[in-house]
Amino acid sequence: MKLEFTEKNYNSFVLQNLNKQRKRKEYWDIALTVDHHVFFAHRNVLAAVSPLVKNLISNHDMKTTDELFITIDPNYLSPTTVDQLLDYFYSGKVVISEQNVEELLRGAQYFNTPRLRIHCNDFLIKSIRRANCLRYLFLAELFELKEVSDLAYSGIRDNFHYWASPEGCVHFMRCPPVIFGRLLRDENLHVLNEDQALNALINWVCFRKDEREKYFKKFFNYINLNAVSNKTLMYASNKLMGMENSSAHSTLIESVLVDRKQERPTSLLSYQRKGALLDSVVILGGQKAHGKFNDGVFAYIIQENLWLKLSEMPYRAAALSATSAGRYIYISGGTTEQISGLKTAWRYDMDDNSWTKLPDLPIGLVFHTMVTCGGTVYSVGGSIAPRRYVSNIYRYDERKETWCLAGKMSIPMDGTAVITRGDRNLYIVTGRCLVKGYISRVGVVDCFDTNTGEVVQCITFPIEFNHRPLLSFHQDNILCVYSHRQSVEINLQKVKANKTTTSVPLLPNNCPLDVSHAICSVGDNKVFVCGGVTTTTDVQTKDYTINPNAYLLDQKAGEWKTLAPPPEALDCPACCLAKLPCKILQRI
């Protein structure tokens, strides 16, 4: 009789014991020295996973009793990384992070271990984001990782307006010439305008003038001077005086300026590259007159006082929410004829004019508030049914492709006003909830830390209004809350609220702001409002109509301006500020 017995996980058992022997320095026959640190191992194990070690053994005709010594340059691989590599060779497990991925790639290159290189490549692809795409592009070029290179380049191109800004240029000035030239040549480069592209070129050259001045002539040809403002052209002309062989460029600039003096003033918009960004307010969904739900997506181009239809949503809904993050607009939730709280979520690509279905929200929501903080999308509060509010704050995890519970507000609310500060904190200001059986807006400010998932500060204040307030930061610690009846300055450091005389005037139609309006801060103390319901002058009839107009509030002057009317009058649409590429004008 014969019986075969097989040990479970025997290979793992053997390697685990070999690794223990390695750490106890038992039966070793190979030593790796890095900056006075010596690591002992077994030739057979390393030869099985590393062609480098295998070739060293075979090329030197080593005997079984011989010992192999390898010295590694500490400037190439640190002792910590070598120790981590040996653990990987023995266990097949490795923890990769943004901090160690570069050295692990060097280790994979040094020991010629393609599987580790694949793991590093996968990590870079899954963890790429705006803040690290420049560094990842450097790594991709250095280690010839094409897929990572393409993704990182797209990330820089799509966020060039950030990298060329004062906030991002500190790191971007180190961009190699081959990458910088490729970016400037790209017609789809996301710049604020051609002025920013020209300024970026000048700053990049001046950062290392002796090394980069030779590239200026070639890269200058990638700038469309007809799309640059007179002010920036004159600034560039002055900068060129300090550069060698720049007379031809100065002549081109002067020619454009002279031609403009002889012609009628025209908009520079038609000359911008396809990727130049337009500050816009995007309106999505909503409910039309007579109760019909809408699926249209409209954009108001602020600079041109112009409305465009961008697309149609994959579903019809009102009381949904939206936020923009780079080239994408995220939408979720809402109500329809059949369902009062939808779980559905979608992402709209403004560049490609395409929609991608996202995983559903954990619960169906209406009147929730979507916001982007640190490049991550959040959903704050909301209602799951009439008079049933939630305190949940959800975060969309791009890597795991799922909605996660990030934390909770201090009380359940919907219709909240949210403002961000930095890449970490959400300030959730007032919201609707049940107070003694009645729907009421409460005066509360929650500072939600997205890193810890906790409300780290909660401030209450007396409230005399029932609409979503307008928010802004004055100085670092002063949060301003504006409404029709009262305005409050909240000192976050001293935890103190003071009333101010500033207030928000009624809309031009003499109606107050309402949760049904699309409200969006567009910067420079200006606020966009459209849609929503308005009451008739005869209060006794209690008739409501949908506001057909759009308005812009100048908070400094305290005045409303009537804008071009929206294509449709909509109640409870979603609204967000977005940067649309100029090619949308050509597409439409």
UniProtKB/Swiss-Prot annotation:
Matches recorded under PANTHER family: KELCH-LIKE PROTEIN 32, LD33804P
Compartmental location: Cytoplasm, Cytoskeleton, Perinuclear theca, Calyx
Kelch repeat windows: 280-327, 328-375, 377-423, 425-475, 476-525, 526-580
Biological source species: Bos taurus (Bovine)
Modified residues (Phosphoserine): S149
General function of this protein: Required for both nuclear and acrosomal shaping during spermiogenesis.
Cross-referenced Gene3D superfamilies: 1.25.40.420, Kelch-type beta propeller (2.120.10.80), Potassium Channel Kv1.1, Chain A (3.30.710.10)
InterPro entries: BACK (IPR011705), BTB-kelch_protein (IPR017096), BTB/POZ_dom (IPR000210), Calicin_BTB_POZ (IPR048070), Kelch-typ_b-propeller (IPR015915), Kelch_1 (IPR006652), SKP1/BTB/POZ_sf (IPR011333)
An example Gene Ontology biological process: proteasome-mediated ubiquitin-dependent protein catabolic process
Lineage, opening ranks: Eukaryota, Metazoa, Chordata, Craniata, Vertebrata
Domain BTB: 28-98
Protein name: Calicin
Hydrolase found in the keyword field: no
Superkingdom of source: Eukaryota
Tissue specificity field: Expressed in testis and in spermatozoa (at protein level).
SUPFAM superfamilies, sorted: Kelch motif (SSF117281), POZ domain (SSF54695)
GO cellular component: Cul3-RING ubiquitin ligase complex; cytoplasm; cytoskeletal calyx; cytoskeleton
A matching Pfam family: Kelch_6
